[in-house]
């Protein structure tokens, strides 16, 4: 793997059974990222079960299973490279904690592949109000995944019909435009994961009416997202250690800005001020750390007891914002009844977890257009998009999504389920900060 290529995290989204695993399994197999002997082995196992079409999907599913069983296997499967980029494939949805990981995890997606099935009835189910195609597209956009490639898959089930392709493409363009995607920048690729059409190479004999890129080529259409070096420093803390002979060492990932040895920093909410004595990443000393670096840094003048996971470090000249309250735009993914003002679930934002109250429902948005459907609604329910005023029940750092994307994305959870996901539009600073 070449180290010089920029690295992108790719998430694969779309309705269940539309062929996400099979398509990615096929791609990894065709470009040589998977040992062909494994595919052979899966083929034999799949045949025995009468499910031969599953052999490519098993590439990913077997790995998931083995990972869940705690067997360490080579995650090289989840990595592949194109001419321009080095990709890490993030667990596709269907994974229980997918939404939470998408927001709080290191698995922050940069770009997405949306897979939809061309099969009669399947496409319609995915794009229906209850379908995952719609939900995942909303979620991806809400979570700041601004670049997308679309695979219109299972084209073999409709005899590679140009009419069916156009019909689906036009419906998707409507959905994607409504959510806020720039549709003229999105490639729509007719694929068959099962027959290997337009996956790693163009297949004009099957789709003579299509003259665009194959899936593998389309991944190079992505633009590299800017790494926010010129923004003020923000480091959400993951852990804090006290090391004998060194002192207090917070650990976290630099999200924005640059941290240098000798810098004066403040860690909020506790208002702990200190000087950076040393920085290291994976046991290698650094003079400075930039966005994307996972680091431990020794701070003089701060005790371990003052800090905890969820605190955020910044420079004393631009301290992280502690929120009295904040306004967010959310999408309700799951709720058994309805949400009204006063509801107090749990807020997950960067590495922090605190109880939060829905203080006021300001507007309900039309999920089809994003325009205001209702001012000051009494309640919101599953499938709704809304603007809400939130009040954290404990001090927590919250930043505007427009200024600090990684600290302005959040999930709302209750009893182990993700209720909603959203972005911060505005923050009212807490007094005394």
Swiss-Prot record:
Enzyme nomenclature, EC number: 3.6.5.3
Domain of life: Archaea
Region (G5): 192-194
Region (G1): 14-21
GO CC annotations, alphabetized: cytoplasm
Cross-referenced Gene3D superfamilies: P-loop containing nucleotide triphosphate hydrolases, Translation factors
Region named G4: 153-156
Keyword match Magnesium: yes
Family of the protein in this entry: Belongs to the TRAFAC class translation factor GTPase superfamily. Classic translation factor GTPase family. EF-Tu/EF-1A subfamily.
Official protein name in the record: Elongation factor 1-alpha
């Amino acid at each position: 793997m070449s180290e010089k290529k920029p690295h992108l995290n790719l998430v694969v989204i779309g309705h269940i059974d539309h062929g996400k695993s099979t398509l990615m399994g096929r791609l990894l197999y065709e470009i040589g990222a998977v040992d062909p002997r494994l595919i052979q082995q899966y083929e034999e196992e799949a045949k025995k079960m009468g499910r031969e079409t599953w052999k490519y999907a098993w590439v990913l599913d077997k790995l998931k299973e083995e990972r869940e069983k705690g067997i360490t296997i080579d995650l090289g499967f989840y990595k592949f490279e194109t001419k321009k980029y080095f990709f890490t494939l993030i667990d596709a949805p269907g994974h229980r904690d997918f939404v939470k990981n998408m927001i709080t995890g290191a698995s922050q997606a940069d770009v997405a592949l949306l897979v939809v099935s061309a099969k009669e009835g399947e496409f319609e189910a995915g794009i229906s109000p209850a379908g995952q195609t719609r939900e995942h597209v909303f979620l991806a956009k809400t979570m700041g995944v601004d670049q997308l490639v679309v695979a219109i898959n299972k084209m073999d089930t409709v005899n590679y019909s140009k009419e069916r392709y156009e019909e689906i493409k036009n419906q998707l363009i409507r959905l994607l435009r409504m959510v806020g995607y720039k549709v003229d920048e999105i490639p729509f690729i007719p694929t068959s994961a099962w027959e290997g059409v337009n996956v790693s190479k163009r297949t004009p004999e099957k789709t003579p009416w299509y003259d665009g890129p194959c899936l593998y080529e389309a991944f190079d259409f992505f633009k590299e997202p800017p790494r926010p070096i010129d923004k003020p420093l923000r480091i959400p803390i993951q852990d804090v250690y006290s090391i004998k002979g060194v002192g207090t060492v917070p650990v976290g990932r630099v999200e924005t800005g640059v941290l240098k040895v000798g810098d004066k920093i403040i860690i909020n909410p506790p208002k702990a001020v200190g000087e950076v004595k040393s920085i290291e990443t994976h046991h290698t000393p650094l003079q400075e750390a930039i966005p994307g670096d996972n680091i431990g840094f020794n701070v003089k003048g701060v005790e371990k007891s003052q800090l905890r996971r969820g605190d955020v470090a910044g420079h004393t000249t631009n301290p992280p914002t502690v929120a009295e309250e904040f306004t967010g735009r959310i999408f309700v993914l799951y709720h058994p009844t309805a949400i009204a003002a006063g509801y107090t679930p749990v807020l997950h934002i960067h590495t922090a977890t605190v109880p939060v109250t829905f203080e006021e429902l300001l507007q309900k948005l039309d999920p089809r257009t994003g325009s205001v459907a209702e001012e000051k609604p009494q309640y919101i329910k599953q499938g709704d998009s809304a603007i809400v005023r939130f009040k954290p029940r404990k001090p927590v750092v919250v930043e505007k999504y427009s200024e600090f994307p990684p600290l302005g994305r959040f999930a709302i959870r209750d009893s182990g389920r993700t209720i909603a996901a959203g972005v911060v539009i505005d923050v009212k600073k807490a007094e005394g900060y």
